[in-house]
Amino acid sequence: MADTATTASAASAAASAPNASTDAPPFQLGKPRFQQTSFYGRFRHFLDIIDPRTLFVTEKRLREAVQLLEDYKHGTLRPGVTNEQLWSAQKIKQAILHPDTNEKIFMPFRMSGYIPFGTPIVVGLLLPNQTLASTVFWQWLNQSHNACVNYANRNATKPSPASKFIQGYLGAVISAVSIAVGLNVLVQKANKFTPATRLLVQRFVPFPAVASANICNVVLMRYGELEEGIDVLDADGNLVGSSKIAARHALLETALTRVVLPMPILVLPPIVMSMLEKTALLQARPRLLLPVHSLVCLAAFGLALPLAISLFPQMSEIETSQLEPEIARATSSRTVVYNKGL
């Protein structure tokens, strides 16, 4: 009760501060700044999460942000602190520190580092005239990066065997490499394709390979949820029970997100580049092809990531009538919520 009272008094102090920002909403510790019920609100929320500027936050600035949030929590906030400063401090902390362990996440594996560190891999995946070795290398590197990001941002409240992550990683690598190599071989053997058509088709091979690997990774790493169910909560955040049906919904939403995510990243650049390569500028200056290709991939990646992860709210809602009878009987709420996962 003491913590609740001090937090409430801190919230009141922040809201009534004379220099409080009129644009920023009242600060809520641990809550998203933007409403999660609308796609636009989720989009704005995830733009904050993937903001690459947080990669350049100094150790001193991080300590100041953490201390400011601690002061807010304990009701010892200094006068004049604005809601904007509190939201900024929370953004910095959430971008750098793991929420369960409070340890710093290695920079390339932070969500804010996903685009800057992942774009070179996307460029490699979409390079024309891939050899067998380069196809295997880029697919392996992409799945390795994804696995590290997933592990670094995992739910660490409960111990999870390393074998689960290894199983998901190996499954994703094997499926991605197998499909990419298989499709490349089929395209090479397709006699009906002209050399230009064959090159164009080969550029789209990474998408089905990556999309199928993403689904494989989700299923292998989270199949236990289908057997045991996931927690569902009422409107007040109280645990209602564990539901296998909610687990199926969560996995389906996550799988759809991971199929949609690589679509613009791996489909748009080949289309755009096939048109740009015909321009007089790039035909006269072929050395510009790689830099232009990289910029196109960066733009596609930067647009696709927040759009894809904004499709579904992190805490999804479902009617109790769609769940197991014991769940419906355990609560008077018409709907419950569940965490769909990363």
Curated annotation (Swiss-Prot):
Segments traversing the membrane: 105-125, 165-185, 256-276, 289-309
A single Gene Ontology CC term: mitochondrion
Description of what induces expression: In brown adipose tissue, expression is induced by cold.
Tissues where this protein is expressed: Expressed in liver and brain. Expressed in brown adipose tissue.
UniProt-annotated location(s): Mitochondrion inner membrane
Chain segments carrying region Disordered: 1-30
InterPro entries, alphabetized: Mtc
Disruption phenotype: Knockdown in brown adipose tissue attenuates whole-body thermogenic responses upon exposure to cold. Brown adipocytes show decreased glycerol-3-phosphate levels in mitochondria.
One Gene Ontology biological process: amino acid transport
A Pfam family of this chain: SFXNs
Function: Mitochondrial amino-acid transporter. Transports citrate. Does not act as a serine transporter: not able to mediate transport of serine into mitochondria. In brown adipose tissue, plays a role in the regulation of UCP1-dependent thermogenesis probably by supporting mitochondrial glycerol-3-phosphate utilization.
Name of the protein in question: Sideroflexin-5
Organism: Mus musculus
Originating gene: Sfxn5
